[in-house]
Amino acid sequence: MKANIHPQFKTVEVSCATCGKQHPIGTTVNSIKIETCSNCHTFYTGVQTFVVKAGPVDKFNKRYGITQDQKVKKFPSNADNQKEPAEEQE
């Protein structure tokens, strides 16, 4: 068998993106980041929490400076759009 072909096994801290808690585990990877852990996952806690992230539309509106007031367009009603028929000229 060849010597020194196996990766180094070490203890690293797994960090949770939601709550920030760190858990030590043994692995060959240098660092691990996870979205949720047993400390903040709804299955283990019984409490539902929300992580607010901006979606693509929010990022677009922020980039181009569009506010909530500018998003609402007021269209004229149908009564305003109807014009009286033009009189026929003889």
Curated annotation (Swiss-Prot):
It comes from the Bacteria. Coiled coil: none annotated. GO terms for molecular function: rRNA binding; structural constituent of ribosome. Gene3D superfamilies: Ribosomal protein L31. GO terms for cellular component: ribonucleoprotein complex; ribosome. SUPFAM superfamilies: L28p-like. Residues 81-90 have a biased composition (Basic and acidic residues). Belongs to the bacterial ribosomal protein bL31 family. Type A subfamily. Part of the 50S ribosomal subunit. NCBIfam families: L31, PRK00019.1. Binds the 23S rRNA. This is Large ribosomal subunit protein bL31. It comes from Aster yellows witches'-broom phytoplasma (strain AYWB). The gene is rpmE.
